[in-house]
Amino acid sequence: MTAEITAEGLPVPPTAIEGEPVAAGASEEEERRRRRKRGLLLLLLGFLAMLVTIVIWYLIFRQPISPPIPLIPESQIPTYATAVYGAQRPSGVAVSPSGDRIYVTQSEGSRVGLVFDAGGNKVGTMAPPESTGTQHVPVYVAVDPLTSEVYMSDRMTGAIYVYDRDGAYQRTFTLAEPRQGWQPLGLAFDAKGNLYVTDLSGPFQKVLVIDRTATVVRTLGENDKLSFPNGVAVDGAGNVYVSDSNNGRLLVFGTDGQVRAQVGRGAGQGNLGLPRGLAMDGQGRVFVADSTGQGVFVFRSPSGDSQRLDYFGFFGGEGIADGTFEYPNSVAVDARGRVYVADTFNDRVQIWSY
């Protein structure tokens, strides 16, 4: 084929001549691009199909590692309000239902119980009979809901003393069938006026349930290897809460006398160190004073057939400032939901409110 000559004498390129095939190589390249696009599309569709399959399988067959923890509103934790001073190494605290009387035991100094009014003014004392100070170590106190009498345990004498609401001594509590060498410590009442006492005596430490005739009607925990049980509390359903202090546990005994829930030591949220005093409020909250944890843990009591204590939170922290603690030992709650904490080594009782 010869090239045509233009009027200017320049040759016309052969590719411009009519009938010559144009861009054959370009068509092949376009086809290769289309094949690559189809391959990528198929690969993407396969990946999406696999992803959908995995999601469907997970939703159908998934097994949670642990029960879900419900979201807890911040209102489940009280805020610091004020403090009551005037006690030396307070170890126990109780409060009248209306909150107009605060009862505090002292483990040092005069070692008598003190009575304060709602404003933190001392209005009375609870002296053990024939008290000479060092012969007594009062520890925990509880208020009888039926008579407003105040019961105080004495670690040194192994006795429970009873006072009127203003602190006047009434009598020494005795069982209908006395137990030789019993060592009462933690005290609590239920709504019917039954008295719950942690007893450190014997080879098996335990909780005694005592009716209005001073008769032991139930014994809890003898087979659960309790070690220095301190606090005890009872909820409206009849569950009994015990701080098994030296084992670092909070145990919940059901109405059948068996452990239905517990919280122990560990590094996670809500795990205890040295649990001591306990208290319940009308909202089903359980307050646990933890001496080495330097604060108070809050749980929700188990309901229905539940076998767990839901963790609400913690308040406190180590220190001497308002709202911090140095070895809190006891906790109480009044009818209005105010929380009282014996802040032992800060020589005060802190009051928290919702």
Enumerate the predicted regions with their spans:
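Short loop/turn segments that connect beta-strands within beta-propeller blades
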Residues: D117-N121, D164-A168, I210-T215, G254-Q258, ...
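N-terminal intrinsically disordered, acidic low-complexity segments at the extreme N-terminus
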Residues: M1-E30
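Beta-rich, blade/repeat-based domains predominating
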Residues: Y85-S98, S131-L146, P178-A191, N223-A237, ...
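Conserved beta-propeller blade signature
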Residues: R101-V104, E149-Y151, N194-Y196, N239-Y241, ...
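Short loop/turn segments immediately following the C-termini of beta-strands
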Residues: S107-E108, R155, L200-G202, S245-N246, ...
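Blade/loop signatures of beta-propeller domains
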Residues: I56-I77
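Blade-level signature of beta-propeller repeat domains, shared across WD40, Kelch, NHL, RCC1
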Residues: E326-Y354
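A short beta-strand motif characteristic of beta-propeller blades
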Residues: P78-Y85, K122-T132, Y169-E177, V216-E222, ...
